[in-house]
């Protein structure tokens, strides 16, 4: 009979790997610890990696609080391509030349996205419309009108530009869609853009460098040692 950790209340910093859902990552921990209450703060798509805050026990009551915290992402955008999902998992809509694009032009254009901006949420998202997730409607070929949402981009740093790949670091408010930011940057550059890679590095004061590697979640002891009491 497996040991139960239902009396555990705390926060775990987890480094979610590529290819699994945030739900499955949390479920793995729930199963290993045999803990009843678990949750996470901010979904990462299967193709995205990085920091996932996993809450256990009474700490799950703090989910809404942590969901509102600022985040930092490291991402690479593929210029010259537009997809229906805003990332490489989607259907290619158009491909365009990037011959007239250089890093100086990119750096100048990202300045217009710093501060408070409005974003139209992507169809491929977990937001709901009349009770149905937008991503479910998108898979059926249905597109509905979405209201713009105000978000804050505190820092939009261009790290490098090589060929058609621009690497960026973004510090932003909760609710920011990096895929939408990539698409909007592609629009002002007049070449289109889509997210190639996305990694979440920070949520508020919590940093990916302090996170538990997913391969270590097989061990209840390693999970417990990384748990932050709340």
Curated annotation (Swiss-Prot):
Its EC number is 5.4.99.25. It catalyses: uridine(55) in tRNA = pseudouridine(55) in tRNA. The active site is at 45 (nucleophile). InterPro entries: PsdUridine_synth_cat_dom_sf, PsdUridine_synth_N, tRNA_psdUridine_synth_TruB, TruB_C. One of its GO terms (biological process) is mRNA pseudouridine synthesis. The keyword 4Fe-4S does not apply. It comes from the Bacteria. Responsible for synthesis of pseudouridine from uracil-55 in the psi GC loop of transfer RNAs. Belongs to the pseudouridine synthase TruB family. Type 1 subfamily. HAMAP family: TruB_bact. This is tRNA pseudouridine synthase B. It comes from Endomicrobium trichonymphae. The lineage of its organism: Bacteria, Pseudomonadati, Elusimicrobiota, Endomicrobiia, Endomicrobiales.
